[in-house]
């Protein structure tokens, strides 16, 4: 896996501009902040942590882990809440995902299918062979 950083560009903080990888691909559907009983965590940070833990659980089924993620798209219902809590978001991310920073996008949305969901995260992983 190789992080792509064009010459002269500043190093991004908390994500990669691009990643090149060869191997077996794993696609993780949109994970939200509820547990296996369908109960939502309370608040954005708690839902983020649960959505990340759910992502890791799905990856584990494929023999993968957070270190294999090459792309994430986060859909958030409140961009202001996201922007105002970046330090806590970063800490929650590192607690679950470690220091793997894939190509990422954060997209503001007016709502998600599950009305109590505050965030939904899609991921793509590559297990190098």
Language-model region placement:
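N-terminal presequence-like segments and the immediate start of the first folded domain
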Residues: 1-70, 76-129
């Amino acid at each position: 896996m190789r992080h792509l950083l064009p010459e002269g560009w500043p190093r991004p903080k908390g994500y990669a501009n691009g990643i090149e990888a060869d191997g077996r691909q794993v696609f993780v559907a949109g994970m939200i902040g509820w547990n296996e009983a369908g109960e939502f965590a309370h608040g954005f940070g708690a839902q983020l942590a649960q959505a990340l833990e759910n992502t890791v659980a799905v990856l584990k089924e494929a023999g993968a882990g957070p270190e294999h993620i090459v792309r994430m798209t986060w859909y958030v219902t409140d961009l202001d809440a996201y922007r105002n809590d970046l330090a806590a978001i970063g800490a929650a991310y590192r607690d679950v995902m470690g220091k793997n920073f894939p190509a990422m996008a954060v997209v503001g949305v007016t709502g998600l299918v599950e009305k109590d969901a505050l965030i939904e995260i899609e991921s793509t992983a590559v297990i190098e062979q």
